[in-house]
Structure formats: structure tokens, C-alpha cells
């Protein structure tokens, strides 16, 4: 017996498969401590495998995992009847339980079941010496209960026996039908053999005629070979054109994707330029406010200087009047302090104005850089559009040269000129941070109208699209 576990299944077996292996010469009981030989026969529709096995199962088992012991069903018996031997060491102990042989295939499915048997000593015959048994009332009651259980088991076994007998009758009938079918098939085989001989003769005659036709059609064969070679060459050309066409399609898709990325970047830079223009406008407003405050302070400073001059003139005229001079000096000191405070405020405002001017210069320079980047991207988009148009022409030419493979035409979405143009570009030698702020000029390709607001320009283009669809 092999040391590893046999193939089993957790599923409950189907009883319709139990008749594929038939057990024979099964005793009603076997003596414990002695090897048991199990005999079985395969039916004509069953094909055994090397991993098939025979096991001893306790009656009322549910799955093939509940075996008590097992041996491999692979044996070298030449006859129809096979046999395997269960060693006494692995057999169940003596008891009143019933067991049965089961044949299990390599998938863990039951293919044959034997009648039940017991492992117990044989009961002595009536002619043997009688033995006087003295039992108590409890033992007698237990024996009666045990006898009742045995009678129930015997009744169940009788029922199983009737079922098995019916199955055997059905199997015998099936075997008889199969024998008749075999005889019919043998007769058909003889008839087929005769027809096969006739067909062989016809085949020989046809082969002779075929040889004659081959001799006659030698030149045609050469033409067919030449045509096949030409067809193969054309197919190779078509395959190479298809590969080239697929490559061009992939390049076209890559360019299309790159163009979409550039459009997204262009839109992003346009939004940034618009935001920076708004920041520049805010800084201009702040600068105008600061200049207004600066002008007001200058006017106030001029008034104070005029008053200071008047006070000095009054001091020169009223040097003789001590009290007036003292009062005037006190007023002059107060006004001097006020003037120093206002001069400090003016210096602070001048520093703030310088900072704002530097920020405006930086933003103007950044805006000019953004405009240059957008112009470069527009030029790149025009170049990509021309390249896509060139690829489309190549695809159209290849599609027209291959009639069985219709090519795809990819329309260039960037054939028209760029809709956005930037006016007032910085002239050579002009600093990016000039005093004037340049505005983005957008021109409509349909009617030639110019716009400074990007949203108004988009709405105008959308109106043209609606008119064209109507």
C-alpha cells in the first residue's frame, strides 16, 4: 500500500456510476487477522488509470475521504477479472460493523461498490458441541437489543441486495444489447472492408489518370507556381505597406497628442498673461494713488515753505519785539518739526513708489517673456500642423495604392492660421519694462474684427460657429 493519500473528493458520489466496476466473489464475512483478496471486473465502457484505487469503507459512508484502508487498483492481471490484496495488518478489528469494497478513480469518483461484509469469526454449526451460557437479565436484554439492531441491518442489507440484483439484471440486459450491437458493427465492418477494396481499385485508377493529367498539365503547373510566387510577392508588398501605414498612424497619433499638450500649455500661458496684466493694472492704480499723495504732499510742503519764509521775514521785521519773536520762534520750531515729519513721509512714499516701479518693470518683463513663449508655441503648432498634413497626404497616397485596404484620413485640425496675434511687440533696443503697457490684440479670421478681451473674442468666434452650423 502506498504511503501517500489516494485521490479523494469532498462531494457525495453519484450512484449512477457504481456499475462501471463489478465486484465478484465477495464473502459475507472475513476472518480477522488474515489477508483479504478482492476480485473485480471492468465493464466495456470504463477505462482504468494508474491512480485508481480500491478501498474498504464502513457502511453508511458519505464521501470517498471516509475510507478505512486502501490499495492501488493498478495490477498486472491479464484476464478480465482483476484482484488486489488487503494486508491483515491494515484491516479493521473484529466487530459487528459492516464494510464494503469501493472502486475509486483518479478523480476521486466512485465507479463500483460491493455487497456489505463483516470482519468476525464464523458462527459454529448446530452439530458442534453445545456450550452452556449463563447470562444475567441485563446481558439478555442487551443481546436482544443487539439482535434487534442486527435484524434491522439485515433488512437494510436485503433491500440493498434487491437493488443490486435489479442493477445486475439491468447490466445483463445492457450487455446483451451491446453484444447484438457488436455483431451488427462487425457485419458493417465486413461490408465496409469490401467497399474499401472497391475504393482502393477506383483510387488506383484515379491515380493513373492523375499521372496522365499531371503530364498534360506540366506547363499549367509552372504558370500556377509563377502566379503563386507573384501573389506572395504582392502580399509581402501589401504587408510592408500596412506596417508602414500603421507606423505613420502611430506617428500621427503622437503628433496629435503633442499638439493637444501644446494647446493646453498655450491656454495656460494665456491665462497667466491675463492674470499678470490684471496685476500690472492694479499696480498702476496704486502708483497713480501714490503719485496723487506725493503731489498733495509737495503742495503742502510748498505752503509750509512759503509760511516759513513769511515767518522768517516777520522775525527780521520784529527783532525788537521780544515776546513776538519768542512766539514766532516757537511757531517756527513747531513748523520745522512738522516739515521734518512731512519730509520723512515724503521720503517713505518715494521709496514705496520706487518699489512699485521696480515691481511693474519685473511684471512687464515677465509678460514680454510669456508673450515670446506663446509666439514660439504658435509657430511650433503651425509646424506640427504642416507635418500632420504631410502625413495625411502620405496616408492618402498609400490608401489609393492599396485597393483592398482602405486607409484612414486624419484631417488636420490646425490648417487655419493662428487666431491670436500680439500687437505692439517690443522693438529692438527697447527695454521690456517701458512706461507703456502693451495689450494683446486678437483678430477674427472671419470678419477681421480686433479684440483686446479674450472672453469677448471667444464669444465672437462661437457666434460665427453657430451661424455656420445653421
Swiss-Prot record:
<keyword id="KW-0968">Cytoplasmic vesicle</keyword>
<keyword id="KW-0072">Autophagy</keyword>
<keyword id="KW-0863">Zinc-finger</keyword>
<dbReference type="GO" id="GO:0031410">
    <property type="term" value="C:cytoplasmic vesicle"/>
</dbReference>
<dbReference type="GO" id="GO:0005776">
    <property type="term" value="C:autophagosome"/>
</dbReference>
<protein>
    <recommendedName>
        <fullName>Calcium-binding and coiled-coil domain-containing protein 2</fullName>
    </recommendedName>
</protein>
<comment type="similarity">
    <text>Belongs to the CALCOCO family.</text>
</comment>
<keyword id="KW-0175">Coiled coil</keyword>
<feature type="binding site">
    <location>
        <position position="444"/>
    </location>
    <ligand>
        <name>Zn(2+)</name>
    </ligand>
</feature>
<keyword id="KW-0206">Cytoskeleton</keyword>
<dbReference type="InterPro" id="IPR041611">
    <property type="entry name" value="SKICH"/>
</dbReference>
<keyword id="KW-0472">Membrane</keyword>
<dbReference type="GO" id="GO:0005856">
    <property type="term" value="C:cytoskeleton"/>
</dbReference>
<dbReference type="InterPro" id="IPR013087">
    <property type="entry name" value="Znf_C2H2_type"/>
</dbReference>
<dbReference type="GO" id="GO:0098792">
    <property type="term" value="P:xenophagy"/>
</dbReference>
<dbReference type="InterPro" id="IPR041641">
    <property type="entry name" value="CALCOCO1/2_Zn_UBZ1"/>
</dbReference>
<feature type="coiled-coil region">
    <location>
        <begin position="132"/>
        <end position="368"/>
    </location>
</feature>
<dbReference type="GO" id="GO:0008270">
    <property type="term" value="F:zinc ion binding"/>
</dbReference>
<feature type="binding site">
    <location>
        <position position="447"/>
    </location>
    <ligand>
        <name>Zn(2+)</name>
    </ligand>
</feature>
<feature type="short sequence motif" description="CLIR">
    <location>
        <begin position="131"/>
        <end position="134"/>
    </location>
</feature>
<dbReference type="GO" id="GO:0048471">
    <property type="term" value="C:perinuclear region of cytoplasm"/>
</dbReference>
<dbReference type="GO" id="GO:1901098">
    <property type="term" value="P:positive regulation of autophagosome maturation"/>
</dbReference>
<feature type="short sequence motif" description="LIR-like">
    <location>
        <begin position="201"/>
        <end position="204"/>
    </location>
</feature>
<feature type="binding site">
    <location>
        <position position="460"/>
    </location>
    <ligand>
        <name>Zn(2+)</name>
    </ligand>
</feature>
<keyword id="KW-0862">Zinc</keyword>
<feature type="binding site">
    <location>
        <position position="464"/>
    </location>
    <ligand>
        <name>Zn(2+)</name>
    </ligand>
</feature>
<keyword id="KW-0479">Metal-binding</keyword>
<keyword id="KW-0963">Cytoplasm</keyword>
<comment type="function">
    <text>Xenophagy-specific receptor required for autophagy-mediated intracellular bacteria degradation. Acts as an effector protein of galectin-sensed membrane damage that restricts the proliferation of infecting pathogens upon entry into the cytosol by targeting galectin-associated bacteria for autophagy. Initially orchestrates bacteria targeting to autophagosomes and subsequently ensures pathogen degradation by regulating pathogen-containing autophagosome maturation. May play a role in ruffle formation and actin cytoskeleton organization and seems to negatively regulate constitutive secretion.</text>
</comment>
<dbReference type="Pfam" id="PF17751">
    <property type="entry name" value="SKICH"/>
</dbReference>
<dbReference type="GO" id="GO:0000421">
    <property type="term" value="C:autophagosome membrane"/>
</dbReference>
<dbReference type="InterPro" id="IPR051002">
    <property type="entry name" value="UBA_autophagy_assoc_protein"/>
</dbReference>
<feature type="zinc finger region" description="UBZ1-type">
    <location>
        <begin position="441"/>
        <end position="464"/>
    </location>
</feature>
Amino acid at each position: 500500500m502506498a504511503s501517500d493519500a489516494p485521490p479523494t473528493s469532498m462531494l457525495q458520489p453519484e450512484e449512477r456510476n457504481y456499475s462501471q466496476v463489478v465486484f465478484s466473489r465477495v464473502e459475507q464475512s472475513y476472518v480477522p487477522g488474515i489477508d483479504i483478496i478482492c476480485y473485480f471486473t471492468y465493464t466495456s465502457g470504463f477505462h482504468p488509470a494508474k491512480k485508481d484505487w480500491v478501498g474498504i469503507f464502513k457502511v453508511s459512508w458519505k464521501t470517498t475521504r471516509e475510507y478505512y484502508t486502501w490499495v492501488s487498483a493498478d495490477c498486472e492481471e491479464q484476464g478480465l477479472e482483476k484482484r488486489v490484496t488487503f494486508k491483515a495488518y491494515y484491516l479493521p478489528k473484529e466487530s459487528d460493523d459492516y464494510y464494503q469494497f469501493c472502486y475509486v478513480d483518479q478523480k476521486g469518483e466512485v465507479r463500483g461498490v460491493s455487497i456489505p461484509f463483516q470482519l468476525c469469526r464464523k458462527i459454529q454449526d448446530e452439530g458442534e458441541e453445545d456450550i452452556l451460557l449463563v447470562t444475567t437479565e441485563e446481558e439478555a436484554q442487551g443481546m436482544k437489543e443487539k439482535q434487534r439492531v442486527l435484524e434491522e441491518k439485515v433488512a437494510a442489507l436485503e433491500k440493498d441486495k434487491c437493488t443490486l440484483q435489479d442493477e445486475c439484471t439491468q447490466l445483463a440486459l445492457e450487455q446483451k444489447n451491446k453484444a447484438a450491437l457488436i455483431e451488427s458493427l462487425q457485419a458493417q465492418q465486413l461490408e465496409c472492408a469490401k467497399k474499401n477494396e472497391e475504393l482502393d481499385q477506383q483510387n488506383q485508377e484515379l491515380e493513373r489518370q492523375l499521372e496522365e493529367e499531371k503530364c498534360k498539365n506540366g506547363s499549367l503547373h509552372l504558370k500556377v507556381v509563377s502566379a503563386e510566387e507573384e501573389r506572395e510577392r504582392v502580399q509581402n508588398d501589401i504587408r510592408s505597406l500596412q506596417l508602414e501605414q500603421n507606423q505613420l498612424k502611430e506617428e500621427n497619433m503622437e503628433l496629435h497628442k503633442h499638439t493637444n499638450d501644446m494647446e493646453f500649455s498655450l491656454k495656460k500661458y494665456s491665462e497667466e498673461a491675463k492674470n499678470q496684466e490684471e496685476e500690472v493694472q492694479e499696480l498702476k492704480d496704486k502708483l497713480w494713488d501714490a503719485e496723487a499723495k506725493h503731489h498733495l504732499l509737495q503742495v503742502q510742503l510748498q505752503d509750509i515753505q512759503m509760511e516759513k519764509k513769511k515767518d522768517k521775514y516777520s522775525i527780521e521785521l520784529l527783532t525788537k519785539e521780544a515776546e513776538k519773536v519768542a512766539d514766532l520762534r516757537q511757531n517756527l520750531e513747531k513748523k520745522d518739526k512738522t516739515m521734518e515729519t512731512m519730509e520723512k513721509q515724503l521720503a517713505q512714499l518715494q521709496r514705496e513708489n520706487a518699489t512699485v516701479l521696480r515691481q511693474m518693470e519685473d511684471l512687464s518683463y515677465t509678460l514680454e517673456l510669456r508673450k515670446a513663449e506663446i509666439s514660439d508655441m504658435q509657430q511650433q503648432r503651425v509646424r506640427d500642423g504642416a507635418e500632420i498634413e504631410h502625413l495625411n497626404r502620405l496616408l492618402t497616397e498609400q490608401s489609393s495604392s492599396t485597393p483592398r485596404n482602405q486607409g484612414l484620413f486624419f484631417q488636420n485640425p490646425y490648417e487655419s492660421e493662428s487666431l491670436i496675434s500680439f500687437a505692439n511687440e517690443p522693438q529692438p533696443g527697447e527695454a521690456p519694462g517701458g512706461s507703456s503697457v502693451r495689450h494683446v490684440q486678437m483678430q477674427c479670421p472671419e470678419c477681421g474684427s480686433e479684440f483686446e478681451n479674450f472672453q469677448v473674442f471667444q464669444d465672437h468666434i462661437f457666434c460665427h460657429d453657430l451661424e455656420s452650423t445653421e
